[in-house]
Regions:
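Transmembrane signal-anchor hairpin modules in multi-pass inner-membrane enzymes, especially those
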Residues: 1-92, 115-123, 127, 183-190, ...
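Membrane-interface alpha helices of multi-pass inner-membrane proteins
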Residues: 25-31, 77, 194-208, 220, ...
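Transmembrane alpha-helices of multi-pass inner-membrane enzymes
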Residues: 45-50, 342, 361-373, 377-405
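Aromatic-anchored transmembrane helix interface
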Residues: 69-76, 90-113, 124-128, 133, ...
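Alpha-helical transmembrane segments of multi-pass inner-membrane proteins
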Residues: 121-154, 161-227, 345
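A membrane-periplasm/extracellular boundary helix in multi-pass inner-membrane enzymes
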Residues: 138-141, 224-267, 282-287, 295
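Long extracytoplasmic/lumenal interhelical loops at the membrane interface
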Residues: 265-279, 287, 291-331
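Hydrophobic transmembrane alpha-helices and their immediate junctions
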Residues: 330-368
Length: 405
């Protein structure tokens, strides 16, 4: 019976690194072509990777069983499903919980596969990462500085496509540059790794996305801190994010009042709008402080007693633009604790890496958490798949080394 369930072994050795390399090569281009294409791309890559892994009769369950992330993921999905019983919109909550379950299932199946890739397979994925960044740089430069001809074509000849159409790709390249730079670093091409980061900075910073600029800047600072202080940097950035998430309810209103007095609304419209949303979220959090309002409640949150921001049709447009506050609002402090634990796991694992690998872990991790604060919603599938793709590519590229610090 067991033999029937095994995929046939052929003379040609399966290479599970190929689907990941293809995904890496398209990771920045896909968000430019399709707003939700990242979900399809990573799903297909994950499925093909697992099939090729099993085709070569490599073990899957032992590594999956020992996954630290799996335990936290199961607890988080279970809490999301439970929260649907008191959610404002149960159907929407169950749909979102199902999407989250599928995404995390794909991630936890592929994660043990990428940890067992051979050095040759890892180099192949690394080449895909570098190629993907170069393709992304070229495409973003053409669209960003050339009048957006590609976006105009995709929008059926629209002569003036909105600039924000590139924002998702800009954020994606700000994250995906880290595994690409790590690959070059591990090959001994450290100058090339630094040059690649500089090229991405030159493309991202002058463009429209403040979230991408913030993520890239914070990531570079964290990487430099890790270079100078070693493991201390991992502890420092991890504790700072936990402390910042827990202190947010006490900081939002003073910061909003300071912004109102000192920062011009026309120049800082986006920041004023986010702070206004966060103040509203904190008021609603205080009404259900322990269990939260239920998964996906942000989309249906009652806005009585508050004036709608000019140009908006509701207080929270899709999400609160702060993932920590969104999780706290919807899932309460227990949900927030699970998210923070899930974020700390990769930093804890990275303590055993070499100093160079720790440096790039710090950069990728800090860039991701920085983008979580002003950027996207916890329930946006494209963002969830982008973060999971980053984690998988980083782990696939990383070549185990002896700790040297």
């Amino acid at each position: 019976m067991t033999a029937v369930l095994l995929l046939p072994k052929t003379a040609v050795k399966a290479n599970p690194g190929i689907p990941l390399a293809v995904f890496a090569g398209l990771a920045v281009l896909v968000p430019i072509l399709s707003q939700r294409g990242q979900v399809v791309a990573l799903s297909l890559a994950a499925l093909a990777t697992v099939i090729l892994h099993l085709r070569d009769r490599r073990a899957l369950w032992p590594a999956l069983r020992d996954s630290r992330f799996l335990r936290v993921a199961v607890a988080y999905v279970a809490w999301c499903l439970l929260s649907a019983t008191w959610a404002l919109d149960r159907q929407m909550a169950l749909v979102q919980a199902g999407q989250l379950l599928g995404a995390l299932l794909a991630f936890t199946l592929v994660l043990p596969v990428v940890t067992e890739l051979t050095s040759r397979e890892r180099r192949l994925v690394g080449m895909g990462c570098v190629g993907g960044i170069l393709i992304g740089v070229l495409t973003l430069a053409i669209d960003g500085y050339g009048g957006m001809p590609l976006q105009s074509l995709l929008r059926h000849g629209d002569p003036h496509p909105p600039v924000h159409m590139l924002n998702k790709a800009l954020v994606t390249i700000s994250l995906m540059v880290w595994p690409a730079a790590l690959h070059l670093w591990q090959l001994g091409r450290r100058a090339c790794a630094a040059l690649l980061l500089c090229i991405v900075v030159a493309v991202v910073v002058p463009q429209e996305s403040s979230t991408a600029t913030l993520a890239l800047s914070v990531g570079i600072v964290a990487a430099l801190l890790a270079r100078l202080t070693g493991r201390f940097a991992l502890w420092a950035i991890g504790l700072s994010v936990v402390a910042g998430a827990l202190a947010t309810p006490y900081l939002v209103e003073p910061v909003r009042q300071w912004f109102t007095v000192h920062m011009d609304l026309s120049s800082w419209w986006s920041a004023h709008h986010r702070l206004y949303i966060w103040s509203f979220v904190l008021e609603r959090m205080s009404e259900r402080p322990w269990l939260g309002w239920g998964l996906e409640a942000s989309r249906a949150m009652p806005d009585f007693g508050w004036a709608i921001w000019p140009g908006q049709d509701r207080m929270i447009p899709l999400h609160p633009h702060n993932e920590f506050l969104q999780v706290w609002l919807e899932l309460g402090p227990f949900g927030l604790a699970l998210i923070l634990i899930a974020l700390i796991v990769p930093l804890r694992v990275a303590m055993s890496y070499s100093w160079g690998q720790r440096m790039f872990v710090a950069g990728a991790w800090a860039a991701t958490t920085a983008a979580m604060v002003p950027g996207y919603g916890a329930g946006q599938t494209w963002w969830l798949f982008t973060v999971m793709g980053l984690a998988l590519l980083y782990r696939a590229v990383l070549i185990p080394e002896e700790d040297d610090a």
